[in-house]
């Protein structure tokens, strides 16, 4: 099992989701990441990865890897905020 840590920004985003089914799907996806299944993931640069959840508005989780065993969930968003979220995730990753 890989260790998963969450930034405050990520926690606030996840807790603010009104879509309870979407939130449950995101939490299930995080569990699969902890089990080593990265799934539908791509690099967006600066050691930041985008994990796509094919549900609702197209949820995304932005994360970075540390020491090859721990994932730090930086921020979440959806397709409509993708560009802004990527920039914020890169900024957060750079400053940890």
Where are these regions (language model features)?
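Enriched for short, Lys/Arg-rich terminal
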Residues: 3-4, 12, 23, 38, ...
């Amino acid at each position: 099992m890989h260790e998963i840590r969450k930034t405050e920004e990520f926690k606030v985003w996840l807790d603010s989701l009104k879509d309870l089914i979407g939130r449950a799907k995101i939490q299930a996806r995080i569990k699969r990441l902890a089990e080593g299944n990265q799934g539908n993931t791509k690099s967006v640069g600066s050691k930041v990865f985008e994990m796509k959840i094919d549900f609702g508005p197209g949820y995304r989780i932005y994360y970075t890897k540390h020491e090859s065993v721990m994932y730090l969930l930086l921020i979440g968003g959806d397709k409509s905020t993708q560009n802004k979220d990527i920039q914020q995730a890169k900024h957060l990753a750079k400053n940890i």
